Protein backbone atom coordinates (compact mmCIF):
# COMPACT_ATOMS: atom_id res chain seq x y z
CA UNK A 1 0.00 0.00 0.00
CA UNK A 2 2.83 2.35 0.86
CA UNK A 3 4.44 1.78 -2.53
CA UNK A 4 1.17 2.53 -4.26
CA UNK A 5 0.67 5.66 -2.17
CA UNK A 6 4.17 6.84 -2.96
CA UNK A 7 3.34 6.64 -6.66
CA UNK A 8 0.50 9.13 -6.23
CA UNK A 9 2.66 12.19 -7.00
CA UNK A 10 4.06 10.39 -10.05
CA UNK A 11 0.57 9.70 -11.38
CA UNK A 12 -0.37 13.33 -10.74
CA UNK A 13 2.70 14.49 -12.64
CA UNK A 14 1.88 12.18 -15.55
CA UNK A 15 -1.69 13.50 -15.67
CA UNK A 16 -0.41 17.08 -15.57
CA UNK A 17 2.07 16.43 -18.37
CA UNK A 18 -0.62 14.75 -20.47
CA UNK A 19 -2.99 17.67 -19.93
CA UNK A 20 -0.23 20.17 -20.76
CA UNK A 21 0.69 18.25 -23.90
CA UNK A 22 -2.97 18.17 -24.96
CA UNK A 23 -3.30 21.90 -24.31
CA UNK A 24 -0.17 22.70 -26.33
CA UNK A 25 -1.41 20.53 -29.19
CA UNK A 26 -4.76 22.34 -29.14
CA UNK A 27 -3.00 25.73 -29.11
CA UNK A 28 -0.83 24.69 -32.06
CA UNK A 29 -3.87 23.42 -33.96
CA UNK A 30 -5.77 26.67 -33.42
CA UNK A 31 -2.69 28.73 -34.27
CA UNK A 32 -2.60 27.01 -37.67
CA UNK A 33 -6.36 27.44 -38.11
CA UNK A 34 -6.02 31.12 -37.20
CA UNK A 35 -3.30 31.63 -39.80
CA UNK A 36 -5.39 29.83 -42.43
CA UNK A 37 -8.42 31.92 -41.47
CA UNK A 38 -6.43 35.14 -41.63
CA UNK A 39 -4.94 34.35 -45.02
CA UNK A 40 -8.19 33.23 -46.63
CA UNK A 41 -10.96 35.38 -45.10
CA UNK A 42 -10.17 38.50 -47.11
CA UNK A 43 -8.46 36.96 -50.12
CA UNK A 44 -11.11 35.75 -52.60
CA UNK A 45 -10.36 32.05 -52.09
CA UNK A 46 -12.85 30.92 -49.36
CA UNK A 47 -11.84 30.66 -45.72
CA UNK A 48 -14.58 28.07 -45.05
CA UNK A 49 -13.20 25.74 -47.72
CA UNK A 50 -9.63 26.02 -46.48
CA UNK A 51 -10.64 25.61 -42.83
CA UNK A 52 -12.25 22.31 -43.80
CA UNK A 53 -9.62 21.03 -46.23
CA UNK A 54 -6.40 21.96 -44.39
CA UNK A 55 -7.30 20.22 -41.08
CA UNK A 56 -8.40 17.12 -43.00
CA UNK A 57 -5.09 17.08 -44.90
CA UNK A 58 -3.12 16.92 -41.65
CA UNK A 59 -5.50 14.47 -40.00
CA UNK A 60 -7.28 16.80 -37.59
CA UNK A 61 -10.76 16.40 -39.05
CA UNK A 62 -13.34 19.10 -39.71
CA UNK A 63 -13.18 21.74 -36.90
CA UNK A 64 -16.89 22.48 -37.40
CA UNK A 65 -18.95 25.60 -37.97
CA UNK A 66 -18.92 26.89 -34.39
CA UNK A 67 -15.15 26.81 -33.89
CA UNK A 68 -14.39 28.40 -37.26
CA UNK A 69 -17.03 31.10 -36.78
CA UNK A 70 -15.51 32.10 -33.43
CA UNK A 71 -11.98 32.19 -34.88
CA UNK A 72 -13.41 34.53 -37.53
CA UNK A 73 -13.82 37.09 -34.75
CA UNK A 74 -10.07 37.64 -35.08
CA UNK A 75 -10.64 38.69 -38.67
CA UNK A 76 -13.35 41.13 -37.66
CA UNK A 77 -11.03 42.71 -35.08
CA UNK A 78 -8.47 43.16 -37.85
CA UNK A 79 -10.85 44.72 -40.37
CA UNK A 80 -12.29 47.08 -37.75
CA UNK A 81 -8.77 48.15 -36.73
CA UNK A 82 -7.69 48.59 -40.35
CA UNK A 83 -10.73 50.61 -41.39
CA UNK A 84 -11.32 52.47 -38.13
CA UNK A 85 -11.13 55.87 -39.83
CA UNK A 86 -13.49 54.80 -42.61
CA UNK A 87 -15.94 53.44 -40.05
CA UNK A 88 -15.76 56.64 -38.01
CA UNK A 89 -16.56 58.67 -41.13
CA UNK A 90 -19.46 56.36 -42.00
CA UNK A 91 -20.93 56.66 -38.50
CA UNK A 92 -20.48 60.43 -38.64
CA UNK A 93 -22.20 60.56 -42.02
CA UNK A 94 -25.14 58.49 -40.79
CA UNK A 95 -25.50 60.66 -37.69
CA UNK A 96 -25.59 63.82 -39.83
CA UNK A 97 -28.08 62.19 -42.18
CA UNK A 98 -30.46 61.40 -39.34
CA UNK A 99 -29.97 64.85 -37.84
CA UNK A 100 -30.11 67.00 -40.98
CA UNK A 101 -31.48 64.62 -43.62
CA UNK A 102 -28.21 64.66 -45.61
CA UNK A 103 -28.61 61.19 -47.12
CA UNK A 104 -26.84 62.23 -50.33
CA UNK A 105 -23.59 62.68 -48.40
CA UNK A 106 -21.11 59.95 -49.56
CA UNK A 107 -20.47 58.46 -46.11
CA UNK A 108 -24.19 58.34 -45.33
CA UNK A 109 -24.82 56.56 -48.62
CA UNK A 110 -21.99 54.14 -47.86
CA UNK A 111 -23.47 53.36 -44.46
CA UNK A 112 -26.89 52.82 -46.02
CA UNK A 113 -25.38 50.53 -48.67
CA UNK A 114 -23.66 48.45 -45.98
CA UNK A 115 -26.92 48.15 -44.01
CA UNK A 116 -28.90 47.13 -47.10
CA UNK A 117 -26.17 44.74 -48.24
CA UNK A 118 -26.15 42.97 -44.87
CA UNK A 119 -29.84 42.06 -44.98
CA UNK A 120 -29.66 39.18 -47.54
CA UNK A 121 -26.98 37.21 -45.66
CA UNK A 122 -28.65 37.97 -42.33
CA UNK A 123 -32.00 36.60 -43.50
CA UNK A 124 -30.42 33.61 -45.26
CA UNK A 125 -28.30 32.80 -42.20
CA UNK A 126 -31.34 32.95 -39.91
CA UNK A 127 -33.26 30.68 -42.27
CA UNK A 128 -30.45 28.10 -42.22
CA UNK A 129 -30.19 28.26 -38.44
CA UNK A 130 -33.95 27.80 -37.98
CA UNK A 131 -34.91 25.43 -40.77
CA UNK A 132 -31.76 23.45 -41.64
CA UNK A 133 -30.50 21.85 -38.42
CA UNK A 134 -28.39 19.36 -40.35
CA UNK A 135 -26.52 22.03 -42.32
CA UNK A 136 -23.14 21.35 -40.72
CA UNK A 137 -23.22 17.67 -41.69
CA UNK A 138 -24.91 18.17 -45.05
CA UNK A 139 -23.43 17.33 -48.45
CA UNK A 140 -23.10 21.05 -49.20
CA UNK A 141 -20.06 21.02 -46.88
CA UNK A 142 -18.56 17.94 -48.56
CA UNK A 143 -15.24 18.00 -50.39
CA UNK A 144 -16.68 17.44 -53.89
CA UNK A 145 -19.17 20.25 -53.35
CA UNK A 146 -16.43 22.61 -52.16
CA UNK A 147 -14.24 21.67 -55.14
CA UNK A 148 -16.96 22.23 -57.74
CA UNK A 149 -18.07 25.51 -56.15
CA UNK A 150 -14.47 26.75 -56.08
CA UNK A 151 -14.07 26.02 -59.80
CA UNK A 152 -17.38 27.71 -60.67
CA UNK A 153 -16.48 30.81 -58.64
CA UNK A 154 -13.08 30.96 -60.33
CA UNK A 155 -14.76 31.02 -63.73
CA UNK A 156 -17.20 33.74 -62.63
CA UNK A 157 -14.33 35.86 -61.29
CA UNK A 158 -12.54 35.39 -64.62
CA UNK A 159 -15.61 36.67 -66.48
CA UNK A 160 -15.96 39.63 -64.12
CA UNK A 161 -12.29 40.47 -64.54
CA UNK A 162 -12.56 40.24 -68.31
CA UNK A 163 -15.80 42.15 -68.92
CA UNK A 164 -16.36 44.43 -65.91
CA UNK A 165 -16.14 48.12 -66.97
CA UNK A 166 -14.36 49.21 -63.73
CA UNK A 167 -15.74 52.75 -63.61
CA UNK A 168 -17.40 53.05 -60.19
CA UNK A 169 -15.58 54.52 -57.20
CA UNK A 170 -16.37 54.42 -53.50
CA UNK A 171 -17.80 57.94 -53.31
CA UNK A 172 -20.44 57.00 -55.91
CA UNK A 173 -21.89 54.11 -53.88
CA UNK A 174 -25.67 53.88 -53.54
CA UNK A 175 -28.11 51.66 -51.69
CA UNK A 176 -28.70 49.73 -54.89
CA UNK A 177 -25.00 48.79 -54.99
CA UNK A 178 -25.25 47.44 -51.47
CA UNK A 179 -28.23 45.29 -52.41
CA UNK A 180 -26.56 43.80 -55.50
CA UNK A 181 -23.30 42.99 -53.71
CA UNK A 182 -25.25 41.90 -50.62
CA UNK A 183 -27.07 39.24 -52.63
CA UNK A 184 -23.69 37.91 -53.73
CA UNK A 185 -22.49 37.96 -50.12
CA UNK A 186 -25.39 35.71 -49.11
CA UNK A 187 -24.04 33.05 -51.48
CA UNK A 188 -21.01 32.79 -49.20
CA UNK A 189 -23.10 30.63 -46.87
CA UNK A 190 -22.30 27.90 -49.39
CA UNK A 191 -18.82 26.55 -48.46
CA UNK A 192 -16.31 27.21 -51.20
CA UNK A 193 -18.00 30.34 -52.53
CA UNK A 194 -15.89 32.82 -50.49
CA UNK A 195 -17.56 35.91 -49.07
CA UNK A 196 -14.83 38.20 -50.34
CA UNK A 197 -14.75 36.28 -53.62
CA UNK A 198 -18.47 36.49 -54.32
CA UNK A 199 -18.71 40.17 -53.35
CA UNK A 200 -15.60 41.12 -55.32
CA UNK A 201 -16.92 39.24 -58.35
CA UNK A 202 -20.31 40.94 -58.12
CA UNK A 203 -18.66 44.35 -57.67
CA UNK A 204 -16.48 43.88 -60.75
CA UNK A 205 -19.47 42.74 -62.80
CA UNK A 206 -21.30 45.84 -61.54
CA UNK A 207 -18.55 48.12 -62.81
CA UNK A 208 -16.43 48.89 -59.74
CA UNK A 209 -12.73 49.66 -59.86
CA UNK A 210 -10.77 46.81 -58.30
CA UNK A 211 -9.37 48.54 -55.22
CA UNK A 212 -12.64 50.32 -54.39
CA UNK A 213 -14.52 47.06 -54.93
CA UNK A 214 -12.27 45.30 -52.42
CA UNK A 215 -12.54 48.17 -49.94
CA UNK A 216 -16.34 48.16 -50.12
CA UNK A 217 -16.44 44.37 -49.81
CA UNK A 218 -14.30 44.50 -46.67
CA UNK A 219 -16.54 47.12 -45.07
CA UNK A 220 -19.67 45.23 -46.11
CA UNK A 221 -18.34 42.08 -44.46
CA UNK A 222 -17.96 43.64 -41.01
CA UNK A 223 -21.59 43.15 -39.87
CA UNK A 224 -21.85 39.70 -41.49
CA UNK A 225 -18.67 38.25 -39.97
CA UNK A 226 -19.43 39.81 -36.59
CA UNK A 227 -22.95 38.40 -36.44
CA UNK A 228 -21.77 34.95 -37.56
CA UNK A 229 -19.11 34.87 -34.86
CA UNK A 230 -21.41 36.10 -32.10
CA UNK A 231 -24.20 33.65 -33.00
CA UNK A 232 -21.81 30.71 -32.71
CA UNK A 233 -19.91 32.11 -29.72
CA UNK A 234 -22.35 30.82 -27.11
CA UNK A 235 -22.49 27.32 -28.56
CA UNK A 236 -18.71 27.15 -29.00
CA UNK A 237 -17.92 28.16 -25.43
CA UNK A 238 -20.65 25.86 -24.08
CA UNK A 239 -18.71 22.94 -25.58
CA UNK A 240 -15.38 24.05 -24.14
CA UNK A 241 -13.69 23.23 -20.89
CA UNK A 242 -11.61 25.89 -19.15
CA UNK A 243 -8.55 24.48 -20.89
CA UNK A 244 -10.25 24.94 -24.23
CA UNK A 245 -10.53 28.71 -23.91
CA UNK A 246 -6.80 29.37 -24.36
CA UNK A 247 -6.54 27.52 -27.71
CA UNK A 248 -9.58 29.42 -28.97
CA UNK A 249 -7.96 32.72 -27.98
CA UNK A 250 -4.76 31.66 -29.76
CA UNK A 251 -6.82 31.09 -32.90
CA UNK A 252 -8.55 34.46 -32.62
CA UNK A 253 -5.31 36.40 -32.06
CA UNK A 254 -3.43 34.68 -34.88
CA UNK A 255 -6.40 35.22 -37.22
CA UNK A 256 -6.47 38.92 -36.30
CA UNK A 257 -2.76 39.43 -36.99
CA UNK A 258 -2.68 37.57 -40.30
CA UNK A 259 -6.00 39.10 -41.44
CA UNK A 260 -4.60 42.61 -41.01
CA UNK A 261 -1.60 41.71 -43.16
CA UNK A 262 -3.84 40.10 -45.80
CA UNK A 263 -6.12 43.15 -46.02
CA UNK A 264 -3.18 45.51 -46.37
CA UNK A 265 -1.51 43.34 -49.00
CA UNK A 266 -4.64 42.85 -51.13
CA UNK A 267 -5.55 46.55 -51.26
CA UNK A 268 -2.01 47.43 -52.35
CA UNK A 269 -1.88 44.52 -54.80
CA UNK A 270 -5.11 45.51 -56.56
CA UNK A 271 -3.80 49.03 -57.18
CA UNK A 272 -1.70 47.68 -60.03
CA UNK A 273 -2.70 44.05 -60.55
CA UNK A 274 -5.72 42.09 -61.71
CA UNK A 275 -7.45 39.22 -59.88
CA UNK A 276 -6.20 36.54 -62.30
CA UNK A 277 -3.84 35.09 -59.70
CA UNK A 278 -6.89 34.18 -57.60
CA UNK A 279 -8.70 32.73 -60.61
CA UNK A 280 -5.78 30.39 -61.28
CA UNK A 281 -5.42 29.50 -57.59
CA UNK A 282 -9.12 28.68 -57.20
CA UNK A 283 -9.11 26.50 -60.30
CA UNK A 284 -6.08 24.57 -59.06
CA UNK A 285 -7.51 24.31 -55.55
CA UNK A 286 -10.81 22.95 -56.84
CA UNK A 287 -9.19 20.45 -59.20
CA UNK A 288 -6.76 19.19 -56.53
CA UNK A 289 -9.47 18.82 -53.88
CA UNK A 290 -11.67 16.95 -56.35
CA UNK A 291 -8.77 14.67 -57.32
CA UNK A 292 -8.01 14.06 -53.63
CA UNK A 293 -11.62 13.09 -52.99
CA UNK A 294 -11.78 10.82 -56.05
CA UNK A 295 -8.59 9.07 -54.93
CA UNK A 296 -10.34 7.98 -51.73
CA UNK A 297 -7.54 9.32 -49.54
CA UNK A 298 -9.78 11.96 -47.94
CA UNK A 299 -11.79 9.32 -46.03
Swiss-Prot record:
Q: Which enzyme class?
A: hydrolase
Regions crossing the membrane: 10-32, 63-83, 112-132, 143-163, 178-198, 213-233, 243-263, 276-296
Q: Which GO terms describe its biological process?
A: cell wall organization; peptidoglycan biosynthetic process; regulation of cell shape; response to antibiotic
Reactions the enzyme catalyzes:
di-trans,octa-cis-undecaprenyl diphosphate + H2O = di-trans,octa-cis-undecaprenyl phosphate + phosphate + H(+)
Top-level taxon of origin: Bacteria
This enzyme's EC code(s): 3.6.1.27
What is this protein for, i.e. what is its function? Catalyzes the dephosphorylation of undecaprenyl diphosphate (UPP). Confers resistance to bacitracin.
**What else does UniProt say about it?**
Bacitracin is thought to be involved in the inhibition of peptidoglycan synthesis by sequestering undecaprenyl diphosphate, thereby reducing the pool of lipid carrier available.
Name of this chain's protein: Undecaprenyl-diphosphatase
**What is the organism field in this record?**
Prochlorococcus marinus (strain MIT 9313)
Amino acid sequence: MGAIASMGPLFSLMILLAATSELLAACWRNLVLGVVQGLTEFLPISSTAHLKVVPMLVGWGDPGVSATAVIQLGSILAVIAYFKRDLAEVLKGIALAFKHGQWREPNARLGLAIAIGTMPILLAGMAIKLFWPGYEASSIRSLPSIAVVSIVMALLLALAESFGPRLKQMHLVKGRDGFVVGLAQALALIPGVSRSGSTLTASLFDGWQRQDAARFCFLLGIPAITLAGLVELKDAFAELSLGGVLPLLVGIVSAAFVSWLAIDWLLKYLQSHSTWIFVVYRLLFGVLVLAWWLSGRSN
